[in-house]
């Protein structure tokens, strides 16, 4: 473990108030403007935010103390987000992924490009820099499936929202340990996603499965 990472973990333990507590990291990845920051606001502050909120290149969230459901063990979880910014940020971004215990890859239900980029860019990036970390796949902004404004905008480009079936197939293709859908606007599925990511940091996570958190 690098010295700067050791210092970071020590600081996290002090912030939590338990210097002996195990610490695990969850990295959120995906294109910009898919709703990652809105998810954080809802999860940490219970604040619904329908607008796009730009974030810095790297933003950390947490830490939070989490109790594993199966074992009852406590662990400190910290969350990182390296905003989508293209290949120019690869050198900076890979440092965060290399120390991640779990990676959550996010795409917007209303953006075919962000969906395609999971397989074309983000999954290869994770395989290169965090190959041992379990992946959780998340389709965000599910409210776009029923929002006529967004449906009309997609129709102008002969597009439709990403379906649940498409999301599950992609999860299987990238060997994700889980597939979830959520909406920060409606407040659905966010807590379940964060809980699943925390659970996936447990070392007993060994097999691939695809599951859905219903948000309809």
Residue ranges and their predicted role:
Residues 206-216:
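Extreme C-terminal disordered tails of eukaryotic proteins encode short linear targeting/docking signals used
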């Amino acid at each position: 473990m690098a010295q700067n990472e050791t210092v970071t973990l020590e600081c996290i333990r002090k912030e939590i108030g338990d210097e002996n507590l195990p610490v695990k990291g969850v990295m959120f990845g995906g294109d910009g403007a898919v709703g990652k920051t809105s998810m954080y606001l809802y999860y940490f502050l219970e604040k619904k935010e329908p607008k796009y909120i730009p974030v810095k290149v790297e933003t950390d969230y947490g830490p939070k103390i989490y109790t594993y459901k199966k074992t009852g063990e406590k662990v400190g979880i910290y969350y990182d987000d390296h905003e989508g910014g293209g290949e120019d940020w690869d050198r900076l971004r890979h440092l965060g992924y290399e120390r991640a215990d779990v990676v959550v890859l996010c795409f917007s239900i209303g953006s075919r490009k962000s969906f395609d980029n999971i397989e074309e860019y983000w999954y290869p990036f994770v395989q290169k820099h965090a190959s041992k970390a379990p992946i959780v796949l998340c389709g965000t902004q599910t409210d776009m499936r029923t929002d006529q404004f967004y449906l009309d905008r997609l129709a102008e480009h002969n597009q439709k929202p990403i379906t649940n079936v498409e999301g599950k197939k992609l999860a299987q293709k990238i060997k994700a340990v889980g597939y979830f859908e959520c909406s920060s606007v409606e407040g659905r599925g966010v807590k379940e996603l964060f809980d699943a990511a925390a659970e996936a940091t447990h070392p007993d996570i060994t097999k691939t499965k695809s599951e859905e958190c219903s948000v309809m």
